[in-house]
């Protein structure tokens, strides 16, 4: 596959098949970007690309060859949104599942590294590049039974913040967005499709929705080139920290 003519600024969004990624792709398309929607689920991103006038690129961020192929298909990149990620399991360290930990590390940390490294030359060449990495408040806090996810998100955040210094003087801005509770497929994936456990995460609160985070990404992308928003934390009003909520109904 080769990329189409790209007269507009190009935004690459990973994890674009659902949730924050899909909403971000739609938001950036409305702002005039040609969006390259990247994810593993081909049918979803192909439908999305048709609807927004973008390009669908089927790729797994944990696969070196797939990421290299992604980079080869793009002649220009102005914005990269590192959104692919997720959690698996909720267990104490003593009962940690190493396969879950490996998956979280590969997807959240090495996936971000692969894509960023592959597209960085094009972002620099754009003359006004932007890298947005969607981490989590789990990149800033810890909570019981969540060490696998918080460790991966801390590492992802450290990667992004380190790059901020390494690119000082280059024409690339970097913004980390750390959401709290967002009602997407996140909890369903974490609990291996257990609808009841996933629903309980949001019980008694009004969580964020994907569009709330996407609007923040759009705001960041619309700032003048001299303005760098280093870190944005976005939580529901009902949430004070990763483990502290005000739940209606007494839960």
Annotate each predicted stretch with a short phrase:
Residues 121, 165-166:
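Alpha-helical segment proximal to the catalytic Tyr-Lys
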């Amino acid at each position: 596959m080769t990329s189409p003519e790209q007269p507009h600024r190009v935004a690459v969004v990973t994890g674009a098949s659902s949730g924050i990624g899909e909403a971000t792709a739609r938001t950036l398309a409305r702002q005039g970007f040609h969006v390259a929607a990247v994810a593993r689920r081909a049918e979803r991103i192909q439908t999305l690309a048709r609807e927004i006038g973008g390009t669908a690129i089927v790729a797994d961020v944990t696969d070196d060859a797939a990421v290299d192929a992604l980079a080869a298909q793009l002649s220009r990149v102005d914005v990269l949104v590192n959104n692919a990620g997720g959690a698996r399991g909720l267990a104490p360290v003593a009962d940690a599942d190493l396969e879950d930990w490996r998956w979280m590390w590969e997807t959240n940390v090495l996936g971000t590294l692969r894509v960023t490294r592959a597209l960085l030359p094009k972002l620099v060449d754009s003359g006004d590049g932007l890298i947005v990495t969607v981490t989590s408040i789990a990149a800033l806090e810890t909570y019981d039974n969540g060490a696998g996810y918080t460790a991966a998100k801390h590492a992802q955040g450290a990667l992004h913040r380190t790059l901020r210094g390494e690119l000082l003087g280059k024409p690339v801005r970097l913004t980390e967005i750390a959401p709290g509770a967002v009602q997407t497929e996140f909890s369903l994936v974490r609990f291996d499709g257990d609808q009841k456990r996933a629903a309980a995460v949001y019980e008694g609160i009004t969580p964020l929705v994907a569009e709330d985070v996407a609007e923040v990404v759009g705001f960041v992308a619309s700032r003048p080139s001299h303005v760098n928003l280093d870190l944005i934390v976005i939580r529901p009003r009902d949430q004070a920290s990763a483990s502290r909520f005000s739940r209606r109904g007494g839960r």
